[in-house]
Amino acid sequence: MENLKSASPEEDSPRHGDNMGKPKRIPRACDMCRKRKIRCDGKQPACSNCVSHGIPCVFTARPKRRTGQRQMYIKSLVSRLEQMESTLRSVIPNYDQQPDIIHPSSTPKNYHDLNCTKGETSSDDSTDDIAFLNEKMGTLVTTPIGSQKYFGSSSTFSIIQHAAKFASGVESDKVLEHLSMAKSGCLFDPDESFDGSKAELPSSEIANIYIDAYFKSYNPLFPVFTRENFYQKFGSPNCFKKPDGSIDLVNYASYVVVLSLGCLAIADTEEQVSRANALFKNTLGISIEVTKDMSFRTLVFNFLTSVYYCAVSKPNAVWLNVGVVVRVAQTLGLHRNSAMWSIGKEDAEEKARLFWYIYYLDRVSSMMTGKPVAFQDDDIDQMVPFYSIYCYYGLKPPEGDPLGTFNFLEAEVQLTRIVGQVLKELYSVSGMKSNSSQVMEKILEFDLLLNNWYNSLPDCMQPRNRFKIPKFCSSNLILTSAIYYSCLILIHRHSLTKNLQVNCVHRGTGSITDSQALCIAAARSITNLFVESVDLQPLIMKIIMYHAFTSSIIIFISILKRPLASICSEDLNCLISVKNRLISFETHGFVRLNVVMDALESMISTAQAAMQKAKQIAINFSSNLATNEDVTNSGMPDIADVSLKSQSHVPPRISSNHSDTSVKSNSPSSIFDNSGYLNSLNNSILQMHQNLQNSSNTNDQYKFDSVQENELHANITPVLDQTMSMFPFKDQLDLNFAAANVYNPNVFDDMGLDCSFYGNGL
């Protein structure tokens, strides 16, 4: 036997070389003893058992196992298993199988007349899906350098997992890899070395240029200073000195942050951006000492620091620093009514305004990162002073101008308050435990609140009338529009991902009332806002950039769910326009968006492939409908068996380089560019559906789900919902988002000083 050999003398050598009289032994049993499972004495040349039975004694050499890598792999599996068990333990005990239809007894006040039903696919039925589990739990991302970040269910990461679920099977794993990024570990570029160099303060002439740029760009968004007040504090050469001759660190730090923001506002080269960062680093070493002085001036400095982190696209730093600002504000009692203290009216209003700016930033940063808000509404009774849009710019309103009598600060506070309530009721830990009926009730409630807020705005301030916005305040109103659209998406996002059918009839006739259609329409609006916005200062563009990317994912999901809808071509053009706008911003904004571009190109390519496959299926389906067969008795054609491999048409692909792309019709037949034909095809499908329901011998495999009338809103045809069950897509989710080392959802996160990316919209 070739695999058998006798033991070598080296293996049989005794432990002590001087004792040569002992018999040679093998430290393991021979093959026969191992086979019979009896004790072997290991003697050589033959053991006692083999000698007594008269058979040859043979030992087979067995290779030693290398257990190092195997143990590491097992340890990794155990860790991942523990994480999954922890996720399941936290979700399954709260599983509630209540009915998914809102009954009159459970309908909130003023909603008895609302038609609110749910589709065939229950959100609770999907609780075992990875996307829904991660949406409930949030995601803990581990980066390649070992740092960890938590992203809640309102962040971009949550919605992109649903996008990956819908896209699974449409395109190749290689194309979809840019969405999951599971193989590469994350979705941001490697960190560059930190440059700790500082810059000296500029001359008075250059400083005045920076100050002027600050008041034209950043101060109108959060007017913590007036020009007169600022020059009164920082206009003299000795503004940094105390009476005893020591340095006033608070004044110095606040002045430097203003210069840094002004330098950033006029930066048109990378050198100027680096100079702004170097100026700002002068404050990092003294920030702790400054914060020890609990005063209103300290609060102003920390708030300006948060604004700077916004300007350099560091949302996680914004969220952390806002937490410090909130604690300082609460220490100073700014969350309580300032009018009740023994201070002057102007001082009380100044403190109240700064408090509400902090409140605004707290809600916006939490919405983008998916983390909890710091301020709780139950603890706040601060007044909202009157502050018109003209006050933001230090202008006197023209006589008779309605904008001069409208409290714009109060409108911003009300909007961000609704954002906080939505985050708490729909995306917090307790909110994610709600069943489908409760979620639909909350959607109706918050949509009514947001719609009432919208109707309270002056006509020229309403987001749909953005072309009527006065030029002097366009930045403020565009930013407010972006927050409004994003809040609308947050309210109705569950309807899209969980297939909830909610009819918001309180919006009235002539308006979109379907919840899914409202979510998609809001996404289209915010992407159009991003594409059409030009000459805006970087802070606003970077905030809108995040919301535009999130909205692109919503539009991507819409295309995958209804690839035969007549508006899909426009939606695809919308995705391409966002990509081209980001290319322009990347060129002139000194930011790196390579991975964002890859993700967008992956979505565009996948959407094109889905539309092409759906059209090909519709062609085969319409050919079968054109025959004279009795569809009532013959059943539906087995479209799932149509071989797409035999198709000569190859779906268009997006090149790896970030070049301008336009949508071209690649339909096998131009007939699909005609929305009338799609409606005709849709009617044929619905008629077949009715015939199949009336047939006694209909195969269950070909039954259609019921079609709700409200699915026809916003050019969304139900043809896809009837076709997708036969779509030759894979049933399982190929993209793995469950691993800890996955994609950083804030795709533009930590871009500024750490040279990473920025983060998390009718």
From Swiss-Prot:
One of its GO terms (biological process) is DNA-templated transcription. The keyword Metal-binding applies. Residues 1-26, 647-668 are annotated as: Disordered. Residues 12-21 have a biased composition (Basic and acidic residues). One of its GO terms (cellular component) is nucleus. The keyword Transcription regulation applies. Keywords: DNA-binding, Metal-binding, Nucleus, Transcription, Transcription regulation, Zinc. It comes from the Eukaryota. PANTHER family: TRANSCRIPTION FACTOR, TRANSCRIPTION FACTOR PDR1. It is found in: Nucleus. This is Uncharacterized transcriptional regulatory protein C530.05. Residues 30-57 bind DNA. One of its GO terms (molecular function) is zinc ion binding.
